[in-house]
Amino acid sequence: MKRILTIISAAAALLSVASCNLEKFPSTAINSEEAMESVADCKAFRNGLYSGLKYAFTGAYVYYTDLQTDLFHAVKNFGNWGGPFYSYNVTASEDAATSIWFGLYGYIGNANFLIAGTEKLLASGTLDEADTKTVQQYYGEACYIRAHLLFNLSQYFCEDYDPETAGTKFGVPVVTKYAPTADSDKYPHRGTLETTYEQIVKDLDEAEKYVTAAGTVNSAYVTKDVVTARQARVALTMHDYETALLKAKTLIDSGTYKLMSDATAYAKGWVNDNLTETIWRIAMTGPDDYGNTYGYFIYNTTGEEGNDDPQYIPEDWVLDLYDQENDIRYDAYFDEREVSLRFTGTVTLFVKYPGNPTLYSKVSNYAHMPKVFRISEMYLIAAEAAYNIGGQDAVACKYLNDLRAKRIAGYEAQNYNGTALRNEIRD
């Protein structure tokens, strides 16, 4: 009997030890409640947040929307790559669409985690003045990134914003807390488009308050100028044309970002991702650190001349929008090349994304650092906003002419008005 009790006691002790081991936190993991206890922790999570953005702003997140706009024509043997988007047959079960949806919400989750961590640290009262400003900057950046990604989701999955109907149209789920779950019953409702944009504007207001880093050309991080650029784009989308014009004009007038006019420098700038007019460029460091790619438009597995095998080529009407002799954008974006298809000959290809040589070792992987905002967009936002305000056609023309004068050699300013002006801005 004594032996039996001894065995039972020993077994109980083993079960107790096993139970304790099961309850121990894995040595290779971090408790989310204790993940951000210092400025260094916040910086590490901030770096991780930015690292994810190289996927959110490249590849399918960019070109699937282009394929839906009739800018490109699929070659005969394109293998149905991107076919559902090209043929307007995207359904809720389309893997690429769901990947974009879940991908962006994953990055929003990362932003929410950083926001919560910085708020906790700021409320702790343990930071000195310098560290407080640093953590506030990180907080503002995370608020900005959440707003940016929510806006992108609304562009992909919602109708165009109309102030008259935004309160009755579907938006996207607004998620502001880090609470990952596989329980779909806990997922928030889509809500209205108005609610979605209210959160976007609120986050941008927070970013404007706490992001104090000055803008620099090709900044890898969110700066005050990045926030202003997004405010301009959001305001234009919301039909708040006065704000859109004001924000765009602020960046133009700052003189920090110069429009490029040299054809060689402009073309090389797209190849090497060093355009001097870029407000925000997501950093990539080399062949082992890049985002999604753009292989559909060239796709050459050997790197040898004549072996280009594109799935899509630009439509003729797109090429005709450019002054092919004098516009510096034409040779940077397009090139007539021999191709390896079901015929032998030359075709004008879209070569805006040939691959940055620093991001591959032998044959191009067609990877590039995303240039999220450029000053050229601010000129177009200013022009369209001025046109829509009414009575400011001359102002709109000025911004359009200023942009074209830098892009087209020998360009002479034009005096457009009305619908003709609107069409010229959009083209």
Where are these regions (language model features)?
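Hydrophobic-face positions in mid-chain alpha helices that act as interaction patches
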Residues: 44, 243-375, 409, 422
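Membrane-proximal, proline-rich intrinsically disordered regions
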Residues: 20-69, 309, 322-324, 397, ...
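Conserved, well-structured interaction surfaces
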Residues: 82-157, 191, 208-213, 363-370, ...
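TPR-repeat structural position
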Residues: 197, 241, 392-393
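Bacterial Sec-dependent N-terminal signal peptides
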Residues: 3, 10-40, 200, 232, ...
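Short, surface-exposed recognition loops and adjoining beta-strand edges that mediate ligand/DNA contacts
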Residues: 32-33, 61-76, 127-130, 157-172, ...
